[in-house]
């Protein structure tokens, strides 16, 4: 995949979610939730501050993150793979 996000943008591949309930029932449609976790595939250079300096991002390629899938999250298909493009501010945590 050849993509370079700009500024404070991050490219994330959503993690797969278990499609069975704890009782073994296969979940489909709206019952099968989409994960809000994923792996960071690419990061931008950083956020440009008012004084013109660039503040580097706190996440790096390979981090597993929990994100808020809100208004600013863009879904794209790149090389047949669905990815999410979001701002670092849409990330809520890094799983360590």
UniProtKB/Swiss-Prot annotation:
Q: Does the keyword Cytoplasm apply?
A: yes
* Family stated for the protein in its record: Belongs to the GroES chaperonin family.
Q: Does the keyword Ligase apply?
A: no
Return the protein name.
Answer: Co-chaperonin GroES
Task: Provide a GO biological process annotation.
Answer: chaperone cofactor-dependent protein refolding
The record's section on Gene3D superfamilies has: GroES chaperonin
Predominantly, its location class is cytoplasm
What SUPFAM superfamilies has UniProt attached to this entry? GroES-like
Per UniProt, the keywords (alphabetical) are: Chaperone, Cytoplasm
Q: Which GO terms describe its molecular function?
A: ATP binding; metal ion binding; protein folding chaperone; protein-folding chaperone binding; unfolded protein binding
Q: Which GO terms describe its cellular component?
A: cytoplasm
Q: Where are the bilayer-spanning segments?
A: none
Please state where this protein is localized: Cytoplasm
Q: Give the function comment from the record.
A: Together with the chaperonin GroEL, plays an essential role in assisting protein folding. The GroEL-GroES system forms a nano-cage that allows encapsulation of the non-native substrate proteins and provides a physical environment optimized to promote and accelerate protein folding. GroES binds to the apical surface of the GroEL ring, thereby capping the opening of the GroEL channel.
Positions the record marks as coiled coil are none
Q: Subunit composition?
A: Heptamer of 7 subunits arranged in a ring. Interacts with the chaperonin GroEL.
């Amino acid at each position: 995949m050849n993509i370079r996000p700009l500024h404070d943008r991050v490219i994330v591949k959503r993690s797969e979610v278990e499609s069975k309930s704890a009782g073994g029932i296969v979940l489909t449609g709206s019952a099968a939730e989409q994960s809000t976790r994923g792996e960071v595939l690419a990061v931008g250079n950083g956020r440009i501050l008012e004084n013109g300096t660039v503040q580097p991002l706190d996440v790096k390629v390979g981090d597993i993150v929990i994100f808020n899938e809100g208004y600013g999250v863009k879904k794209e298909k790149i090389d047949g793979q669905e990815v999410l493009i979001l701002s670092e501010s849409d990330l809520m945590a890094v799983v360590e």
